[in-house]
UniProtKB/Swiss-Prot annotation:
The gene is rpoB. DNA-dependent RNA polymerase catalyzes the transcription of DNA into RNA using the four ribonucleoside triphosphates as substrates. It comes from the Bacteria. The RNAP catalytic core consists of 2 alpha, 1 beta, 1 beta' and 1 omega subunit. When a sigma factor is associated with the core the holoenzyme is formed, which can initiate transcription. The keyword Nucleotidyltransferase applies. Its EC number is 2.7.7.6. InterPro entries: DNA-dir_RNA_pol_bsu_ext_1_sf, DNA-dir_RNA_pol_bsu_external_1, DNA-dir_RNA_pol_su2, DNA-dir_RNAP_su2_dom, DNA-dir_RNAP_su2_hyb_sf, RNA_pol_bsu_bac, RNA_pol_bsu_CS, RNA_pol_bsu_protrusion. One of its GO terms (biological process) is DNA-templated transcription. The keyword Transcription applies. This is DNA-directed RNA polymerase subunit beta. One of its GO terms (molecular function) is ribonucleoside binding.
Amino acid sequence: MVYSYSEKKRIRKDFGKRPQVLDIPYLLSIQLDSFKKFTDQDPTGERGFEAAFRSVFPIKSFSGYSELQYVSYKLGEPVFDVKECQIRGVTYSAPLRVKLRMVLFDREAAAGTVKDIKEQEVYMGDIPLMTDNGTFVINGTERVIVSQLHRSPGVFFDHDRGKTHSSGKVLYNARIIPYRGSWLDFEFDPKDALFVRIDRRRKLPATIMLRALEYSTQDILDLFFERIQFKIKKDSLVMALVPDRLRGETASYDIKAADGSVLVEAGRRITARHIKQLEQSNTTELEVPVDYIVGKYAAQDYIDEDTGEVLVSANNEISLEDLAKLSIAGIKEIDTLFINDLDHGAYISDTLRIDSTTNRLEALVEIYRMMRPGEPPTKDAAEALFQNLFFSEERYDLSKVGRMKFNRRLEIAEDEGNGVLSKDDIVCVMKKIIEIRNGYDEVDDIDHLGNRRIRSVGEMAENQFRVGLVRVERAVRERLSLGDLNELMPQDLINAKPISAAVKEFFGSSQLSQFMDQNNPLSEVTHKRRISALGPGGLTRERAGFEVRDVHPTHYGRLCPIETPEGPNIGLINSLASFARTNSYGFLETPYRKVVEGVITDEVEYLSAIEEGRYVIAQANIEVDSTGRMVEEQIACRHKGESTFMRAADIQYMDVSPQQIISVAASLIPFLEHDDANRALMGANMQRQAVPTLRADKPLVGTGIERTLAVDSGVVVVAKRGGVVDYVDASRIVVKVNEDELRPGEAGIDIYNLTKYTRSNQNTCINQRPCCFVGEPVVRGDVLADGPSTDLGELALGQNMRIAFMPWNGYNFEDSILISERVAQEDRFTTIHIQELSCIARDTKLGSEEITADIPNVGESALSKLDESGIVYIGAEVKGGDILVGKVTPKGETQLTPEEKLLRAIFGEKASDVKDSSLRVPNSVKGTIIDVQVFTRDGVEKDKRALEIEEMHVAQARKDLGEEFKILEEGVLSRARNLLLSAGYSEAKLAELPRKDVLIQVIDDEAKQTELEQLAEQHEELKADFDKKFEIKRRKITQGDDLAPGVLKIVKVYLAVKRTIQPGDKMAGRHGNKGVISKICPVEDMPYDEEGNPVDIVLNPLGVPSRMNIGQVLEVHMGAAAKGIGNKITAMLEEQREIAELRGYIKQVYELGDDVLQRVDIDSFSDDEVVRLATHLKGGIPIATPAFDGAKEKEIKQMLALAGLPESGQLTLCDGRTGNEFERKVTVGYMYMLKLNHLVDDKMHARSTGSYSLVTQQPLGGKAQFGGQRFGEMEVWALEAYGAAYTLQEMLTVKSDDVNGRTQMYKNIVDGNHQMQPGMPESFNVLLKEIRSLGINIELDQE
């Protein structure tokens, strides 16, 4: 493998044995691609804005003399960029402008004569845009729209599993689900009649539906039944024989062949053997007794031609009297319906008998009554309603997906078709459900991923946009029909409010629009790849059963079987598997390698769950020889959702990678194959809660996916083009681009600005720091700067800690963790949290609030950290209760005497009219102010601090743009100098010229002169561009802010809190091994090895066997080996050994392992590169052990041996307190530990007095309300059991809801008098009132 300069800094030793045929696709593509499809112009009009507009326009007036047509649309440019939107708290969006054409027709002239056409561009609201990282900025906060897994449109056949009826009979049902429109259900009842429901309303006999579709009784019988023909003889009947129809019946008469021989005797059951004999004897007719026809049903009406009397009606049971009538009328042949109990049920025939309607009109009226109960039906209304239900394109749409699924299920050849239903469609569904009831077909599996599809952002946004457009359509149609249209323009007809409201509602408050989880890069990526079955049009937690939540065979390679939340949402919220993607229909696909005649090719095909069932698919870990031919005879594979063994020649596809079945979070767990699934689930979920530490530390034992994840998450800065690093500081990196990657006529400089100390959604700190140096070559895709939780471009969520598995004085009882003081001293788990506190000055009824340092009744010391505008300084260290922003609010006017009014008028306002409503630091928070933002309403005068901040921002913008201009200008000038040098100018002559005069020289060579002129032109463009950019920036900074109504000013203060690790904080490994820190132990008391090195963390060995997450033990051994190798390399560097020796040792390390694919050609590295690599390996050699394809036990032992450690991975430890050796050897090594965002500082709080609940007068609960501890029913029992009467009394009275008692108690304590007088608890009064509300008068007699 070829490594770039920056990749050579630190190479991860990979133990993977399988070749990667396919790289993991871009992780955020599900979000970005979906939204791109929505916003991109689509000439076909099948999706996005185009589809929405075409589905609603043209809008015709009721009279038909005017219409509004859609021409085209255009998305404008956003006013503010993403960062500005986040600071200002506005939505990152672009205006949508639509070109509309209003056409007026001449009323007098012939139809369709155009009188007037007006075209105009109309504003249709702002559409939120997606950022490059797949998020939306809504009102200044980053949000993610989670994709939804919902039931695909189409037709589904199912049964009730025998739960509906007490007999346990299985009732079948069919449901046609459109993309939008009414649902149509067909279902059997316990008596086997078929019913229809529309939109889950009252059921009607299904034949009503057929009658409404203009089928007569006769048509219905012909559609669903075969006929049996009988010829009427004198004493008997002759039946036309179809032998197969007799199967399973008991012969009630002797069945004879054509030659008269008896084939089946009366009373015998007719079997397949008899039928075969009948077929062979070529018997076409069979003589049967007259009573054989009794009980069968007529297939048509039989009419006496002379009288016109109906002798036997279609679908009526035939009796002997009927037969006699037919004979008398001279009818020689009669057809009956072929019905049997085995596989040709009388379902439709029975249903027709329940059906009270006889013609189409009656059927339509019946449907109208069911849909609109209580309204008198008319013929037109009934017809219009039925037509609109399933046959109108405006009201009903199966969609492309629905039509495809519908046609495939009903075995119709083509996938394309109409979006509305046809008569044939409905009949086909009824035929299919009868087939299923007769046992010819199976019901569908609702949880199969071929029946559930993904709805992503773009599609959901389009649907909301269409909802808004439909609301507009109604208003436009009314306006088109009113008044004089000659004066109006399209703009006057359209009101964009409903569209904006629909879109805003979706992005702001939809269940699937979620506040982005921004704890660390992994949690961001996982959130964007989440697939939820909840949400509008989806399931609800309460109704979702076990089957929906369970892992389904079709999840393989599509949804992760491991990563899902614990709790009520388990199985309803899933994560996309690493390689999965959605196809054009919205079904999940996963890639497979094609296998031809037992040989694996490199051709990769994506298959959806529907297609996958047809093929035989082998796993990725099968043995192959050097040519790619499968070695084993019988190969483990999957076919139709079952695991089985097949011959190599039968295999058609093979997995692309062992990691393909799991999600990104699960594939970050090393040795995942040795962990129990439940613990792996916790491990995957807890990595998302890891807080970025102060200094990120790459995992020694990783899986090789860390780099992909860090780059795709967007938190690191990646080189857009190759080149050489020209300039680096903490906030910007400048790269001089390679000549061969330049676009013609550009300066060839790329500038990357870094994000510094900003707040994430979870209050963690986002900060980028450069990881490259000036002069380093970079190629496209190299990481230039690390973000939060990344180290040299690799994801680094925690720290590598030296751990020992042993009990230690009970301090690691029940998963507690004992850590060394050194961990805290070295700031290994110190994190920075940034809080945003805002102070809003409003315009109140009594006057406006004011932000000022002049606050009543506050001492000088409290104002010491405020400037003259009343706003805290940047850099001030503040603690709970300190004032951050001074604010005063006008008090209600007290009634003044005339004298006071006079004094007030003479001496002006007194400070007594205002009360202090300043912004203070919340209790238990201590930190440093790192930034202040002031937003002032347009038209309100800015205070001194706001102007200072504005000046600072303008100066910063000028500096940034100036430096950018300088760098770009230098690029142009250096190219001009090189041109002049090549044209014969000497270095000395160039040195004499003023800097910019190189552009105005004259050269003899015409081509070079043209090039020089181009450069001069480019320089002018740069200058103009700089002025324009600066002016835009300055205008944005100085303009007033658009604040909410009634708000005059907002001050936002950002407070950075540094949190060191302490007892009570939650920590975890990556294998679901979580615990709480019980004690921070002095270094000298920690167990240490024979060389005197103490361990950092002591874990309880009892946490491993019962949890079955052995992966952690293997990780510890591998970590010990990795660190040991690092120590050896450190020793070599310190002893300044020969580079050849160093190179040899490193080579030995990278070549270790059986069949390991990775080949690192250390021999091709220069000496400098070897030393630089060795320097980066000093802390330990990073290792990749991919999931299901990782290092084996033997390889771990080889690594330990290479590091000079015992192969058992166990050491003799000594007790730090006594110096004695422990009796047994202890497993010691390195584990990657995470600090989770469950910090004790955020949970602990204390209260003496505070706020009380209004009704019960009991203290509130929870830290947010500054509440108390609940002393509940069971705690009362405990005190009663102890007989602690006085303690119990004070708990239930003065400490809780005895209002007078508690105030008195407070006074007594202040006075030093420690006595209490308990009174009546308020909750007792509440109880009395409750009883009275039931109409029982209850009074308390106090004697």
